[in-house]
Amino acid sequence: AASQEASKPKANGAAAKNKSNGTPFETAFRNIDDALWKDPGCTSELDYTEQTSWILFLKYLDDLETVKQMEAELQGKKYTPIIEAKYRWPVWACPKGKDGKLDHHKALSGPDLVGFVNQQLFPYLKGFKQKATGPNTIEYKIGEIFSEISNRVQSGYTLRDVLEHVDALHFRSQEEKHELS
């Protein structure tokens, strides 16, 4: 493992640790790269990008669902989220207490988190492809995405760290969405 880590590119490495300036997105991405660099399942920049992407996608999707739900409520309508409750970001990725902070008693970590992601979350999301009414639906696209990738993060503690960094990001305003691009 030590020789594997020595051969890994350092992404943003030590230089990033000395820089705290930058946008919240830049800071989060540096922290995510630093966390993934330590994981034995992520051995290249391509791995960092793929793993960061699926996590960001699920956070983005949950923020989008939250906005749609709020808009429906303002119009006196009911909105049913695409993702079942137990697979929504605030339930599995970053459950919060009444104070709005991460509830460490409910938050999965270590082998429990990796087990949930690999054995429940990914199979659930892959199943969207079969349930979709057509290839142009968001459900089909979700299923297609999660049929093509896998969770490579082996440490549930690393994954917990990455989830917390991503959770600090929000994709609710146009400015926030633009910053991500």
Predicted regions and their residues:
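Non-catalytic, mostly N-terminal accessory regions of nucleic-acid modification and defense proteins
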Residues: 1-181
